[in-house]
Amino acid sequence: MSRTVFCQRLKKEGPGLDFQLYPGELGKRIFDNISKEAWTEWQKKQVMLINEKKLNMMNLEHRQLLEKEMVSYLFEAGEVAIDGYTPPSQ
């Protein structure tokens, strides 16, 4: 049986992640407070962000930028701004 969490991003109960996907205290916070649905949404945004901004994950500054965007998106209800992208609903 999967575990249930109250997702801070979606503000509703949902299935939690199966295991901690990110290291450290932030990873624990994500595991305890973010649902699979919200994590999947973040992964899509993350791929777009990496591609559009041409981020190199070997570069510490780029990883820090991505982590900052992740925290904003998952916990502060921030949206990922991607230049030139218009969501399908608009």
From Swiss-Prot:
Gene3D superfamilies: Fe(II) trafficking protein YggX
GO CC terms in record: cytosol
GO biological process terms held by the UniProt record: cellular response to oxidative stress
Keywords, sorted A to Z: Iron
Family: Belongs to the Fe(2+)-trafficking protein family.
Function: Could be a mediator in iron transactions between iron acquisition and iron-requiring processes, such as synthesis and/or repair of Fe-S clusters in biosynthetic enzymes.
Protein name (record): Probable Fe(2+)-trafficking protein
Organism encoding this protein: Aeromonas salmonicida (strain A449)
Lineage: Bacteria, Pseudomonadati, Pseudomonadota, Gammaproteobacteria, Aeromonadales
